[in-house]
């Protein structure tokens, strides 16, 4: 498969161009690092462990935990090809022995540590592991369903019920198999071979199936060769629910194939040929690779959402063609005839990795160029950045049917890739890493041998050979992943008297080790890891930081890891001769020989990446806690990320230094002077500043100080005046964006799935406050740009500085968001609320000026991203853009934008706009107005919901007590709404009578005498609603001097409106009313008349009796007893008037008894 045919192509200048010419098997390839440092060369620096020491150390440990002796299978220059794990189970050996030469055997190596061999109608599943001495007796043989086609391991899938990372027992492993026709057989537990469920997938037509994949929630996806995907969900009842995954539901579906192709996104096509599928467990995403596109689905336990379909032909063909044939003079003619097939899809830390084969039929000789394309999935779409690595594997083209190469990427955290077919394996790199492994072909061409499949176990690449069984391919230990000079320096830093024996002799005695020694020993373990000696590295780590250690040990771990990371970041370039006299005698010991500062920074970034890989591999990452920084604790994992962010920022700053040396050098001198650094004569200020990367952020404040000085000194119309603002903005923006970009893109490297304890509040270095803090710097620059630069700038300069300022504000607000997310709302509510209030205020302070300056688009971009609804509403109001407001209501529906807008209208007194919302918003407006009934009736009338309006108005009238006039108006409006509604005749009559009763009561207040109101200084339009007792009191009070029988009769009528709940004795009040009426007349003499009835006929009391009689009231029941009336204290002096008593009794006899 991998002949040593020379490539006719000339390599390009970049590391991602075409293959090098004349490289055959075992050749040392180019490297992705600096020239002249082939990674395959021997390491000449001092080593920590000699081979003898390594063997003795292993034997003294008893049972080793990582690296083991294995039988070497084949010769290789750069790689160890050895048998993997324990010997194959007897059933597997028998199957291989009894199989005929032409029998199709396939293997599936599952990342959960199981291998599946398909041999004819049998499926053999067994447990695999790194250790050859572990007793692995688990081996099950299952019967496959009948099929007219060959059975394939691609149609076997295992699902695990135990959490990821745990050892899976047979009880926790479920197995599903499929045939190409669609027959399904499902074993809910591998422990029960005889217990299974069968089903058949019939999706119509003559489809055949190619892949079966275990996905979310114990379910599976069956993929047809035509790219139809079917979700299979086993149910507890024994049935297997099946449904087809949705197609073309992405954000651009429905806009047409021609239009969507402009975006690189296509609708599914019926003529697609499926090449590969991929399940991303971390993101719950499923990908399919076809002959023309990559499609993505987002899954939960029972449903799926189609995210997008990406046209790889349009997006990748030119990149691949250019990488291979780009240097040809007739390139434009060549690229029209290039053929490309997309063969396989895998994933690593850099993104999706596609294996593609390209050839041009007119080439002589015509070769197949295998390339690895890395693309990052940004969630809703693919990244624009594409990396094409053209491998050095380029066999002659024979037939398209013979292009059968496959890909495995065994370790997610690095860039090593393995291409394979039935006769050979080709080791290479994806080209996105900081170093390149030697590319080499490993042949399996012994008689009867072939490669049946490949996969990974614990990050180790595994090949299944027909003759040798499970085989691992690993880089030789003496090929360090560090650059040769850096690796040697690291070894020197931990080497000392008897350093080789010290590590194991000290740790095996289990004595207390000083913190400094722990750091040194951990460095030594890191060095061994870089030399691919994971076994020794793990042993050192296990001794230093036992998994059963106490809290003190874990805090020492945080200190040691942090110190090593800082040492890497602030390393002295000791082997640079200019630094020779300036390196402290006890420098940390990570020196490198790059004479160019930029390369020094890049090497430090590589070393940091290796350190993170090491921390993960040896099991320390999950134990990291917190470490103090800037006076407060920070999660150590995030502190490590901060170190890499500062390296990213320093690299960006160095690039600016190359272009803007005067500006950056001035700021560097200010920073170094503040630290009171003396610069050696043989070094530049930049040498000194960029060496200490941990302090790179100090330059930000210094840039502003220089900028302010220039703005004060330079004329406003000078080029220097404008350039200094633009350049300082650019440097700050690019540094902060580089840090933020690293934090987001490499999040998986520093993310902890489940934290055992709550982590401290996270304040990124890009969000520090106080003097010199980045937040302080941004606020200060915000003021400089808007108050100094902007007013004096022309329109072009204004556009430039505004765009830069928006980027700085974005970084500022993003820091607050990260900080807020780290505060636990439930346990620290007060802190969260205070921080959120601070954030909201700062957000408003930074964005509001953009509105004032009319920079609406920039203000909108930030306000939309950070959900500043106040800014968005203000902007729409200022520009009278109602359609944009409606869009925001939809866009931010889940964040209650509509409620915010309605509340804003209320607060600003814009009730007309509130009530003039389009019909589409009526539902939300109605919900909002439920809490604002004083307005909701207007919306209900506007919406012709008159019954609701009547009820709302009546409710408001019933609750109104503050203003009599308002209550009367609301009651009147309620009656009008009822009359205009669709109430039935009976219902309407009932409601009208209810309201008329209230109006009768209100009439008593409305008809209070004007003289009385003036006397009491009352006004009907401003009066509160009075209760019945209050009205009675007014009608019978002495100030009502003109009170007559009508007033007292009203007072008596009001007794009917006193509720039983009120603590008032109605009979006593009635007695008081009658007594007050009696007192209004003169009862001193008869005026010469003998008839008491005639004498009193004009008295108010008698006129009241006459009105009561006229109303048909039974006086004997209504009036109090005459004796009770005569004894009432309210009569005052009348109580002792004999004449009054005579006349009263006479009237009682005349009117009361006469009625009887």
UniProtKB/Swiss-Prot annotation:
Where are its TM segments located?
none
**Mutagenesis or variant effect for residue 974 to R:** In NPHS18; loss of function in nephrogenesis; unable to rescue morpholino-induced nephrogenesis defects in Xenopus; decreased interaction with NUP107
**Which GO molecular function annotations are given, in alphabetical order?**
structural constituent of nuclear pore
Carrying Omega-N-methylarginine, the residues are 17, 30
Q: In which tissues is it expressed?
A: Widely expressed in fetal and adult tissues. Expressed in the brain and kidney.
Q: Which residues carry this modification: N6-acetyllysine?
A: 787
* Record-annotated disulphide pairs: none
Query: Which residue ranges are recorded for the region named Disordered?
Result: 1-39
Q: Which UniProt keywords apply?
A: Acetylation, Centromere, Chromosome, Disease variant, Epilepsy, Intellectual disability, Kinetochore, Methylation, mRNA transport, Nuclear pore complex, Nucleus, Phosphoprotein, Protein transport, Translocation, Transport
What InterPro entries does this protein's entry cite? Nucleoporin_Nup133/Nup155_C, Nup133-like, WD40/YVTN_repeat-like_dom_sf
What GO cellular component entries does it have? cytosol; kinetochore; membrane; nuclear envelope; nuclear membrane; nuclear pore; nuclear pore outer ring
Modification Phosphoserine occurs at: 7, 15, 27, 41, 45, 50, 72, 131, 480, 489, 493, 501, 755, 1133
Q: Which residues carry this modification: Phosphothreonine?
A: 28
Quote the Pfam families the UniProt record gives. Nucleoporin_C
* Positions of post-translational N-acetylmethionine modification: 1
Q: Which domain of life is it from?
A: Eukaryota
Q: Which disease is it linked to?
A: Nephrotic syndrome 18: A form of nephrotic syndrome, a renal disease clinically characterized by severe proteinuria, resulting in complications such as hypoalbuminemia, hyperlipidemia and edema. Kidney biopsies show non-specific histologic changes such as focal segmental glomerulosclerosis and diffuse mesangial proliferation. Some affected individuals have an inherited steroid-resistant form that progresses to end-stage renal failure. NPHS18 is an autosomal recessive, steroid-resistant progressive form with onset in the first decade of life. Galloway-Mowat syndrome 8: A form of Galloway-Mowat syndrome, a severe renal-neurological disease characterized by early-onset nephrotic syndrome associated with microcephaly, central nervous system abnormalities, developmental delays, and a propensity for seizures. Brain anomalies include gyration defects ranging from lissencephaly to pachygyria and polymicrogyria, and cerebellar hypoplasia. Most patients show facial dysmorphism characterized by a small, narrow forehead, large/floppy ears, deep-set eyes, hypertelorism and micrognathia.
Provide the function of this protein.
Answer: Involved in poly(A)+ RNA transport. Involved in nephrogenesis.
Question: This protein is called what?
Answer: Nuclear pore complex protein Nup133
What organism does this protein naturally occur in?
Answer: Homo sapiens (Human)
Task: Quote the gene name from the UniProt entry.
Answer: NUP133
């Amino acid at each position: 498969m991998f002949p040593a045919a020379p490539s006719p192509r000339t390599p390009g200048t970049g590391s991602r161009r075409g293959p090098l010419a004349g490289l055959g098997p075992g050749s040392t390839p180019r490297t992705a690092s600096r020239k002249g440092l082939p990674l395959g060369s021997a390491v000449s620096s001092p080593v920590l462990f000699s081979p003898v020491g390594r063997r003795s150390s292993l034997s003294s440990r008893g049972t080793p935990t990582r690296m083991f002796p294995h039988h070497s299978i084949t010769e290789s220059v750069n790689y160890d090809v050895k048998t993997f794990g324990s010997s194959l189970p007897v059933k597997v050996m028998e199957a291989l022995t009894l199989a005929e030469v032409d029998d199709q055997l396939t293997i599936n190596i599952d990342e959960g540590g199981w291998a599946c061999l398909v041999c004819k109608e049998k499926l053999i599943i067994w447990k695999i592991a790194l250790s050859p001495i572990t007793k692995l007796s688990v081996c099950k043989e299952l019967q496959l369903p009948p099929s007219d086609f060959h059975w394939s391991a691609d149609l076997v899938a295992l699902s695990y019920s135990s959490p990821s990372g745990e050892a899976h027992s047979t009880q926790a492993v479920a197995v599903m198999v499929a045939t190409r026709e669609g027959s399904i057989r499902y074993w809910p537990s591998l422990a029960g071979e005889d217990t299974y469920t069968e089903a058949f997938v019939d999706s119509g037509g003559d489809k055949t199936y190619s892949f079966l994949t275990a996905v979310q929630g114990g379910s599976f996806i069956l993929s047809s060769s035509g790219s139809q995907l079917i979700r299979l969900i086993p149910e507890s009842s024994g049935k297997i629910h099946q449904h087809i995954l949705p197609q073309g539901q992405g954000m651009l579906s429905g806009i047409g194939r021609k239009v969507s192709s402009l975006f690189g996104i296509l609708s599914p096509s019926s003529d697609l040929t499926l090449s590969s599928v991929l399940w991303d467990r971390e993101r719950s995403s499923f990908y399919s690779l076809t002959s023309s596109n990559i499609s993505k689905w987002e899954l939960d336990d029972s449903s799926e959402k189609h995210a997008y379909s990406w046209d790889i032909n349009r997006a990748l063909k030119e990149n691949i063609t250019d990488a291979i044939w780009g240097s040809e003079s007739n390139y434009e003619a060549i690229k029209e005839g290039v053929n490309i097939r997309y063969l396989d899809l895998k994933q690593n830390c850099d993104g999706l990795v596609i294996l593609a084969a390209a050839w041009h039929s007119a080439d002589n000789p015509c070769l197949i160029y295998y390339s690895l394309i890395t693309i990052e999935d940004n969630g809703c779409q693919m990244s624009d950045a594409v990396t094409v690595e053209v491998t050095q594997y380029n066999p002659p083209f024979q037939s398209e049917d013979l292009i059968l190469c496959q890909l495995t990427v065994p370790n997610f955290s690095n860039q090593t890739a393995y291409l394979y077919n039935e006769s050979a394996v080709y080791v290479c790199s994806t080209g996105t890493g900081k170093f390149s492994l030697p590319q080499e072909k490993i042949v399996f061409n012994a008689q009867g041998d072939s490669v049946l499949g490949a996969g990974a176990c614990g990050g180790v690449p595994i090949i299944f050979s027909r003759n040798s069984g499970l085989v691992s391919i690993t880089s030789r230990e003496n090929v360090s992943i560090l650059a040769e000079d850096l690796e040697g320096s690291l070894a020197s830093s931990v080497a000392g008297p008897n350093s080789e024996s010290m590590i194991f002799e000290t740790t095996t005695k289990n004595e207390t080790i000083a913190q400094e020694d722990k750091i040194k020993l951990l460095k030594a373990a890191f060095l061994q890891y870089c030399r691919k000696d994971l076994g020794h590295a793990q042993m050192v780590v296990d001794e230093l930081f036992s998994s059963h250690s106490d809290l003190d040990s874990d805090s020492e771990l945080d200190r040691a890891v942090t110190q090593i990371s800082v040492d890497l970041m602030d390393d002295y370039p000791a082997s640079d001769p200019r630094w020779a006299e300036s390196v402290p005698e006890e420098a940390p010991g990570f020196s490198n020989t790059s004479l160019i500062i930029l390369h020094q920074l890049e090497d430090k970034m590589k070393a940091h990446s290796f350190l993170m890989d090491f921390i993960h591999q040896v099991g320390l990452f999950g134990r990291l806690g917190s470490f103090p920084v800037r006076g407060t604790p920070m999660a150590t994992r995030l502190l490590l990320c901060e170190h890499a962010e500062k390296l990213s920022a320093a690299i960006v700053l160095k690039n600016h230094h190359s272009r803007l040396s005067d500006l950056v050098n001035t700021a560097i001198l200010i920073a170094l002077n503040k630290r009171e650094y003396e610069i050696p004569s043989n070094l530049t200020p930049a040498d000194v500043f960029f060496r200490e990367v941990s302090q790179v952020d100090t330059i930000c404040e210094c840039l502003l100080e220089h900028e302010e000085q220039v703005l004060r000194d330079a004329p406003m119309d000078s080029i220097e005046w404008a350039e200094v603002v633009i350049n300082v903005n650019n440097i700050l923006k690019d540094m902060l964006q580089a840090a933020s970009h690293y934090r987001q893109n490499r999040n998986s490297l520093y993310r902890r799935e489940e934290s055992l304890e709550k982590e401290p509040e996270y304040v990124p270095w890009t969000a520090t406050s106080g003097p010199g803090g980045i937040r302080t710097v941004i606020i200060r620059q915000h003021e400089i740009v808007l108050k100094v630069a902007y007013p004096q700038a022309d329109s072009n300069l204004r556009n430039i500085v505004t765009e830069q300022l928006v980027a700085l504000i974005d970084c500022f607000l993003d820091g607050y968001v990260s900080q807020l997310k780290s505060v636990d709302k439930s346990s620290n509510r007060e802190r969260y609320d205070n921080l959120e209030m601070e954030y909201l205020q700062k957000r408003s302070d930074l964005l509001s000026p953009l509105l004032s300056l009319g920079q609406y688009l920039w203000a909108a971009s930030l306000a939309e991203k950070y959900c500043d609804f106040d800014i968005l509403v203000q902007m729409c109001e200022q520009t009278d853009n109602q359609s944009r407001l409606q869009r925001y209501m939809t866009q931010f529906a889940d964040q209650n934008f509509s409620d915010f807008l309605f509340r804003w209208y209320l607060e600003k007194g814009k009730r007309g706009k509130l009530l003039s919302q389009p019909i589409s918003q009526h539902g939300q407006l109605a919900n909002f107005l439920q809490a604002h009934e004083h307005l909701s009736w207007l919306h209900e009338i506007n919406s012709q919901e008159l019954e609701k309006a009547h009820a709302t108005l009546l409710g408001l009238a019933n609750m109104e007590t503050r203003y009599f006039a308002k209550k009367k108006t609301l009651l009147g409006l309620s009656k009008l709404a009822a009359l205009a509604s669709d109430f039935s005749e009976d219902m309407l009559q009932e409601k009208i009578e209810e309201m008329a009763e209230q109006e009768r009561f209100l009439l008593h207040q409305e008809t209070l005498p004007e003289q009385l109101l003036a006397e009491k200084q009352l006004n009907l339009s401003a009066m509160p609603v009075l209760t019945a007792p209050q009205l009675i009191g007014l009608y019978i009070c002495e100030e009502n001097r003109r009170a007559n029988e009508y007033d007292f009769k009203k007072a008596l009528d009001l007794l009917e409106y006193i509720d039983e709940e009120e603590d008032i004795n109605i009979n006593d009040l009635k007695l008081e009313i009658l007594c007050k009426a009696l007192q209004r007349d003169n009862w001193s003499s008869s005026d010469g008349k003998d008839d008491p009835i005639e004498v009193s006929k004009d008295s108010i009391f008698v006129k009241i009796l006459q009105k009561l009689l006229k109303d048909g009231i039974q006086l004997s029941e209504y009036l109090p007893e005459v004796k009770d009336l005569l004894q009432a204290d309210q009569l005052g002096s009348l109580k002792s008037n004999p004449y009054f008593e005579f006349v009263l009794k006479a009237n009682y006899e005349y009117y009361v008894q006469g009625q009887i």
